[in-house]
């Protein structure tokens, strides 16, 4: 037993997670009714979601209160990269539709009581109202736009505080970070539970009914992750981007895939940024901001499902209209965190461009919920891993350096 524990401690976290995935897969097939195993996954995700808002709040306040005048944070570059990548992903999804046009069987209404927004203006109105939420309520409800807003305000206000007060805030941030590390070390057990739940509840039958749709969605996201994002990174860094890209996918994308929550993956991304030696003043803000607005995966989902509906109804779409759809999808995706139901509930906004009725659009949303187990996992993995990628790329960029 001692030898086993010693070997386990020396094993890297990714290898431990891989072992957890394999065990969860077999347990889901062999003992699908052992629901207690799934509880481990719920506890893990719950722990990450519980600590993440406090982590963001304390880190941002601490970083801003001790920020040096004239210090460079690269935030404008990072936001530019977030927007560029989201639009590029939306455009790639349009191109994929021309190569692999999909059609859907629209006969089952969406199994959801959620109502889609009436337009982009409603999406951003909701987002703006969430920003000025009560800070205590924002932390308890994991409203990251509001958490960031108030953390920035408090951080700037604390710049004039004495050093002892700033050190106390830093100690609180360090203690929160330590709790996060303890929770992340439980990832192999938690992910084992998540894999078990996914396999025992959904099985693999979903692949047969919606295999082509899943293949196109996942394939497009992989293309963006392994081709488009590396091209953007190369343009910025002027060196081989793949070691960084693959590191982000391995250390951030894998956990995001199983937690299916950008918010829950914030602590994982913070730790990865620390391991990469990035500037804490920058990543303490860019990572939670990315979790809210960096939505390349959402843009892909919106465009592919919307254009599949267009193809199903026999509507002809010229490229200028498809380009406009890319703009709408990119803008809508950036506001996905302000909509209950995320990217799927923004599909009716995009469908409205083509005069598709809300009834039909909600049937498309229903198809999205059916493939959501795989779609949402891949979407979150792409979104969350690129938060770290573009934070690192901005810091390593050749532009602006003498």
Curated annotation (Swiss-Prot):
Membrane-spanning parts: 19-39, 43-63, 86-106, 138-158, 179-199, 212-232, 287-307, 327-347, 354-374
Q: Where in the cell is it found?
A: Cell membrane
Tell me, in one coarse class, where this protein mainly resides. membrane
Its Gene Ontology molecular function terms? neutral L-amino acid:sodium symporter activity
GO biological process assignments? serine transport; threonine transport
Fetch the Gene3D superfamilies from UniProt: Sodium:dicarboxylate symporter
**Which keywords describe this protein according to UniProt?**
Amino-acid transport, Cell membrane, Membrane, Symport, Transmembrane, Transmembrane helix, Transport
How is this protein positioned relative to the membrane?
Answer: Multi-pass membrane protein
Q: Which reaction does it catalyse?
A: L-serine(in) + Na(+)(in) = L-serine(out) + Na(+)(out); L-threonine(in) + Na(+)(in) = L-threonine(out) + Na(+)(out)
Q: Does the keyword Kinase apply?
A: no
What is one cellular component GO term in this UniProt entry?
A: plasma membrane
Q: Which family does it belong to?
A: Belongs to the dicarboxylate/amino acid:cation symporter (DAACS) (TC 2.A.23) family.
Q: Which HAMAP family does the protein's record reference?
A: Ser_Thr_transp_SstT
Q: What does this protein do?
A: Involved in the import of serine and threonine into the cell, with the concomitant import of sodium (symport system).
Per its record, how is this protein called by name?
Serine/threonine transporter SstT
Q: What is the lineage of its organism?
A: Bacteria, Bacillati, Bacillota, Bacilli, Lactobacillales
Gene that encodes it? sstT
């Amino acid at each position: 037993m001692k030898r086993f524990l010693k070997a386990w401690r020396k094993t890297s976290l990714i290898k431990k997670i891989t072992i957890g995935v394999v065990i969860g897969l077999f347990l889901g097939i062999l003992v699908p009714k052992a629901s207690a195993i799934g509880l481990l996954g719920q506890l893990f995700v719950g722990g990450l979601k519980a600590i993440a808002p406090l982590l963001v709040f304390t880190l941002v306040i601490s970083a801003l209160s001790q920020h040096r005048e004239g210090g460079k944070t690269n935030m404008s570059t990072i936001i530019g990269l977030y927007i560029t990548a989201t639009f590029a992903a939306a455009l790639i999804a349009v191109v994929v539709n021309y190569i692999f046009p999909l059609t859907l069987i629209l006969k089952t209404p969406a199994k959801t009581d959620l109502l889609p927004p009436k337009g982009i203006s409603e999406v951003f109105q909701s987002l703006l109202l969430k920003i000025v939420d009560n800070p205590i309520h924002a932390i308890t409800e994991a409203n990251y736009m509001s958490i960031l807003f108030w953390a920035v305000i408090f951080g700037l206000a604390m710049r004039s505080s004495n050093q002892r007060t700033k050190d106390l805030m830093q100690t609180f941030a360090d203690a929160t970070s330590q709790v996060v590390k303890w929770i992340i070390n439980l990832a192999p057990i938690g992910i084992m539970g998540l894999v078990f739940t996914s396999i025992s509840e959904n099985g693999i039958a979903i692949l047969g009914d919606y295999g082509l749709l899943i293949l196109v969605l996942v394939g497009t996201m992989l293309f963006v992750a392994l081709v488009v994002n590396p091209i953007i990174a190369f343009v910025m860094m002027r060196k081989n981007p793949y070691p960084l890209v693959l590191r982000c996918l391995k250390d951030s994308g894998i956990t995001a895939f199983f937690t299916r929550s950008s918010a829950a993956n914030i602590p994982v991304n913070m730790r990865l940024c620390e391991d990469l030696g990035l500037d804490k003043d920058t990543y303490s803000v860019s990572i939670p901001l990315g979790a809210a607005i960096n939505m390349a995966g959402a843009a892909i989902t919106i465009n592919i499902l919307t254009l599949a509906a267009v193809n199903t109804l026999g509507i002809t779409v010229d490229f200028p209209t498809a380009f406009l759809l890319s703009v709408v999808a990119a803008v809508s995706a950036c506001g996905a965190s302000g909509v209950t139901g995320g990217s799927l509930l923004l599909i009716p906004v995009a469908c409205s461009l083509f005069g598709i009725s809300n009834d039909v659009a909600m049937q498309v949303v229903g198809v999205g919920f059916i493939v959501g187990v795989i779609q949402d996992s891949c979407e979150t993995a792409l979104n969350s891993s690129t938060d770290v990628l573009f934070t690192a790329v901005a810091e390593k960029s050749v532009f602006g350096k003498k």
